[in-house]
Design a protein with these regions (language model features):
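Fe-S-dependent hydro-lyases/dehydratases of central metabolism
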Residues: 1-360
């Protein structure tokens, strides 16, 4: 961080000046975490109050309530869709224009509904759902579309699982992957420190606008609908080349051999490489990087805790990574690392060589 400030001191001084000089400007210090993770943890309001001019309503006057919306220069800005905030990634010029008060223009898109039923099987994570979405929606073709999730299966997904699914929107090809507001959303807002007044406002406004997830309400009409039974989702691996080239974990070995055969690779071929003065023999399929990271994984605490538990058990069993494996730990925010610390799981990660290299 010291080097970061040395190299970018002039930029940071300018940003600090901007925060002190203008209303409605908040600057997040470097090293705090990745933008969309901080947004769902701290900044997103879901429902907001102000006058049309963007100035807080004076006491005693009736405020204007409106939905929180978001544009960001990171392609995974749709993470906030998981807690009911409509938003997507834009280019730098569009973002600057929005920051200076100009409107964002967009064509009215097709809205594709994803009807969710059932619930996830034990051991299946939100990332597995996201990879299933990627394959399903890529095959459907949703480029330029809004995707909205609905159906009885919503009740089985908590808010962080939803944000994990929304996070991978760019991999689906859609503009956003929006979830409605419900009790799961409110529980997350409370957990992350939003006031009871704010939580009550979100609930009342979502219900008044028809954005509340009400199982008894008539289903909305969409341009098209695809269905997914969550109980059919299996543990999956992304790749080998693209996220939607999904491989079921149970078929990983078989698919690896098939892919090598398709590419004409000799599985018996070995190469000797020098790793810190030690000769190591590597072949096709050798793991080079073990990364507990990505903004997608860090969005859902249960996946980070799973990684911590695996590391703890591995360390207790005396296991160590091979010398050629680079180990990386990059939580999405300080809150994610604090969760691992308080759960007593950081020691196991460090024993295996997973030290925090940064946040985000």
């Amino acid at each position: 961080m010291e080097l970061e400030f040395q190299r970018n001191g002039e930029r940071y001084n300018f940003l600090k000046w901007a925060q002190e000089s203008f209303q409605n400007v908040r600057i997040v210090p470097p090293g705090a975490g990745i933008c969309h993770q901080l947004n769902i943890e701290q900044f997103a309001q879901v429902a907001m109050t102000s006058t049309a001019a963007g100035v807080e309503t004076p006491e005693g006057e009736n405020p204007t309530v409106y939905f929180d919306t978001l544009v960001g220069t990171d392609s995974h800005t749709p993470t906030a869709n998981g807690i009911g905030v409509l938003g997507w990634g834009v280019g730098g010029i569009e973002a600057e224009a929005a920051a200076l008060g100009q409107p964002i223009t967009t064509l009215v898109p097709k809205v594709v509904g994803v009807r969710l039923t059932g619930e996830l099987s034990e051991g299946v994570a939100a990332m597995d759902v996201a990879l299933t979405f990627a394959k399903m929606l890529r095959e459907k073709g949703v480029v330029g579309c809004f995707v909205e999730c609905f159906g009885p299966g919503l009740d089985s997904l908590n808010a962080t699982q939803r944000t994990c699914i929304s996070n991978m929107t760019p991999e689906y090809g859609s503009t956003c992957t929006l979830f409605p507001v419900d009790d799961q959303t409110l529980a997350y807002l409370r957990l992350t420190g939003r006031s009871e007044q704010q939580v009550a406002l979100v609930e009342q406004y979502a219900k008044a606008q028809g954005f509340w997830n009400d199982p008894q309400a008539p289903e909305r009409v969409y341009s098209d609908v695809v269905e997914l039974d969550l109980s059919s989702v299996k543990r999956s691996i992304a790749g080998p080349s693209r996220p939607h080239d999904r491989i079921f974990l149970e078929q990983a070995q078989e698919r690896f051999h098939e892919i090598c055969a398709d590419r004409g690779l000799d599985l018996g071929k070995k190469e000797t490489v020098d790793v810190n003065g030690r000769a190591c023999e590597l072949g096709h399929g050798a793991l080079a990087i073990a990364a507990v990271t990505s903004c997608t994984t860090a969005t859902d605490p249960s996946m980070m805790l799973t990684a911590g538990l695996v590391a703890k058990k591995a360390a207790e069993a005396g296991l160590k990574p091979k010398p050629w494996v680079k180990c990386i730990l990059a939580p999405g925010s300080h809150a994610t690392e604090l969760l691992l610390e308080r759960a007593g799981l950081m020691d196991g990660l460090r024993d295996l060589g997973f030290y925090t290299c940064g946040f985000g």
